[in-house]
């Protein structure tokens, strides 16, 4: 299949620039895999589509304020570091802009010198390996000095950092939010629990590769970025219990989905596990664990719309997207959602 098979027309004004004041008041397109029926609802109506005994799987990763603005010690030139992957307590793989200002041995200061850094090596892809120097807890320093790295298609400044975090986020490590989860409120989660729906949490730290375009014509030639995931025994037991009792496993977002499908065996069972995944799901893939999917509306020609197409069918997915454009749904990270059942 070619990347152009996943293209669609999207007017720029439909790209949501800021979140809604009330998270669960966004729109929800409900798609029925068996009948092809399309319904238009509000996100909090999701509670009516889930049954007691179902298991909803959410990604509890938290977005790091991973964008740091530093000053080079010798020239005082400004430079931006984006933290991509932690190597150890002091060393990170980073994306640097402009790269020409960050050569091996160059040193940088952040804030009033609370944080210092030195470039120790440069990868083939141009990413810099940087060793930081600091006293105290790195995450606390990052909270003070760092900024949330918003996706490139969001042009407006985000006044409240927490609006780009899910209400259940706790495991810091992502470069981007698992955006399907942004629609849930504490109240909605409580309603689901009261109905007897089980909520299970896993972690997948979203990398910046999620925004990288597919640059090959043939999608099978695309090399997927790898991301760290972790699933506890408690979560695995809840998912397996739902499967064994004939209930549905509902993935909230593509990140939960990729984790579940990485861990799942041929019988749809999962186990406690952590590691790195570079799973690339596109049409032809047979889902093992995920029965239903909640996800936002994604970029044209992205690996995410390919994942959705593998779940719902390419033509069905593109039809749903065309309906969403016609009905003026809001797209991407701060946009509306779809529920495929």
Curated annotation (Swiss-Prot):
Belongs to the QueA family. Transfers and isomerizes the ribose moiety from AdoMet to the 7-aminomethyl group of 7-deazaguanine (preQ1-tRNA) to give epoxyqueuosine (oQ-tRNA). Pfam families: Queuosine_synth. It comes from Clostridium kluyveri (strain ATCC 8527 / DSM 555 / NBRC 12016 / NCIMB 10680 / K1). Monomer. It catalyses: 7-aminomethyl-7-carbaguanosine(34) in tRNA + S-adenosyl-L-methionine = epoxyqueuosine(34) in tRNA + adenine + L-methionine + 2 H(+). It is found in: Cytoplasm. Keywords: Cytoplasm, Queuosine biosynthesis, S-adenosyl-L-methionine, Transferase. This is S-adenosylmethionine:tRNA ribosyltransferase-isomerase. One of its GO terms (molecular function) is S-adenosylmethionine:tRNA ribosyltransferase-isomerase activity. GO terms for biological process: queuosine biosynthetic process; tRNA wobble guanine modification. One of its GO terms (cellular component) is cytoplasm. It comes from the Bacteria. Pathway: tRNA modification; tRNA-queuosine biosynthesis. Its EC number is 2.4.99.17.
């Amino acid at each position: 299949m070619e990347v152009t098979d996943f293209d669609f027309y999207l007017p720029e004004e439909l790209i949501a620039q800021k979140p809604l004041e009330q998270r669960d008041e966004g729109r929800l397109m409900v798609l029925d895999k068996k009948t092809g029926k399309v319904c238009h609802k509000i996100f909090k109506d999701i509670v009516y589509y889930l049954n007691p005994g179902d298991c909803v799987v959410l990604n509890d990763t938290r977005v790091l304020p991973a964008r740091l603005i530093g000053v080079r010690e010798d020239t005082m030139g400004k430079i931006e570091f984006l933290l991509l992957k932690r190597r150890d307590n002091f060393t990170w793989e980073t994306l640097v802009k402009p790269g020409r200002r960050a050569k091996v041995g160059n040193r940088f200061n952040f804030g009033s010198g609370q944080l210092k850094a030195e470039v120790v090596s440069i990868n083939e892809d141009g990413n810099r390996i940087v060793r930081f120097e600091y006293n105290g807890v790195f995450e606390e320093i990052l909270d003070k000095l760092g900024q949330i790295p918003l996706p490139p298609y969001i042009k407006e400044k985000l006044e409240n950092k927490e609006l780009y975090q899910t209400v259940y986020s706790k495991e810091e490590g992502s470069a981007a939010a698992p955006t399907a989860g942004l629609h849930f409120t504490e109240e909605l989660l409580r309603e689901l629990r009261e109905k007897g729906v089980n909520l299970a949490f896993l972690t997948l730290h979203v990398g910046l590769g999620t925004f990288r375009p597919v640059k090959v014509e043939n999608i099978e030639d695309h090399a997927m970025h790898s991301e760290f995931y972790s699933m506890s025994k408690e979560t695995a037991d809840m998912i397996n219990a739902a499967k064994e009792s004939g209930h549905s496993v509902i993935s909230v977002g593509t990140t939960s989905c990729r984790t579940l499908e990485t861990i799942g065996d041929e019988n749809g069972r999962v186990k406690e596990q952590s590691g790195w995944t570079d799973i690339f799901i596109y049409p032809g893939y047979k889902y093992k664990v995920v029965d239903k999917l909640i996800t936002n509306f994604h970029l044209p020609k992205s690996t995410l719309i390919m994942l959705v197409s593998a779940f719902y069918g390419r033509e069905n997915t593109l039809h749903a997207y065309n309906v969403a454009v016609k009905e003026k749904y809001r797209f991407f990270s701060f946009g509306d959602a779809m529920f495929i059942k």
